[in-house]
């Protein structure tokens, strides 16, 4: 959906991980080779799959595929399954890619939908993609620019609008469950819950999402 929407207004070079990369943050690959596989190559759209992390994808796009060529006007990543509010920004592969784009001094945006279902309906996000992209491209929002866009999992008519806000200071209370595999070997499974340390603050991303923004 992100490609289909952006393609309406721009030429696209897409370099995306070939597998899900949740929780990869700003990880890069140092101990194995990276490969690119061409998926689509047609006028206005080139798509490649990479066996690396989201940040690897941005790096290889800038430092290999566009070396000596015109730099892009914008870097966009997503659409992420689930929230990238609060401390989740630091763990997010989606936002890792967007932040990496900012390191190249290119305006960058990461999109997320608060729905973890594999068959999540991203239609709600779609209506905000182009308006936010146009704003990032045409208004002086400062440089480097990296926007973290989170959309609540609500019907479109229930979303109250776009609210610029700061990052919540909450964090995860982590619990490692000790389990055993079929051969009797112990292993650990990360669980836990998010603790909002400033629930009364009305200027944070957590508040905005819980209140339909």
Predicted regions and their residues:
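Short beta-strand segments
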Residues: 15-17, 51, 77-80, 111-112, ...
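Short, structured loop/turn "capping" segments at alpha-beta junctions
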Residues: 69-72, 108-110, 139-146
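Electrostatically charged, flexible surface regions
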Residues: 123-213
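A cross-family phosphate/adenosyl-ligand binding-site feature
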Residues: 4-64, 71
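Alpha-helix C-terminal capping segments
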Residues: 61-68, 96-107
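Glycine/threonine-rich flexible loop motifs
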Residues: 83-92
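Glycine-rich phosphate/pyrophosphate-binding loops
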Residues: 102-124
């Amino acid at each position: 959906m992100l490609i289909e929407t952006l393609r309406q207004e721009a030429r696209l070079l897409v370099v995306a991980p070939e597998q899900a990369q949740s929780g990869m943050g700003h990880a890069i690959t140092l101990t194995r080779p990276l490969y690119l596989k061409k998926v689509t190559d047609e006028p206005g759209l080139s798509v490649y799959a990479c066996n690396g992390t989201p940040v690897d994808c941005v790096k290889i796009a800038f430092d290999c595929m566009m070396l000596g060529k015109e730099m892009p006007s914008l870097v966009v990543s997503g659409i992420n399954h689930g929230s990238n509010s609060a401390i989740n920004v630091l763990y997010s592969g989606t936002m890792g890619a967007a932040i990496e784009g900012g390191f190249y001094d290119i305006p960058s945006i990461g999109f997320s939908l608060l729905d973890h279902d594999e068959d999540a309906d991203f239609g709600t996000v779609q209506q905000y993609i182009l308006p936010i992209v146009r704003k990032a491209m045409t208004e002086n929002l400062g440089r480097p620019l990296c926007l973290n866009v989170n959309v609540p999992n609500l019907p479109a008519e229930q979303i109250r609008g776009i609210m610029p806000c700061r990052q919540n200071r909450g964090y995860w209370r982590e619990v490692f469950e000790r389990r055993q595999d079929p051969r009797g070997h112990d292993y650990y499974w990360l669980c836990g819950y998010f603790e909002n340390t400033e629930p009364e603050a009305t200027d944070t991303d957590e508040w905005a999402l819980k209140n339909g923004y």
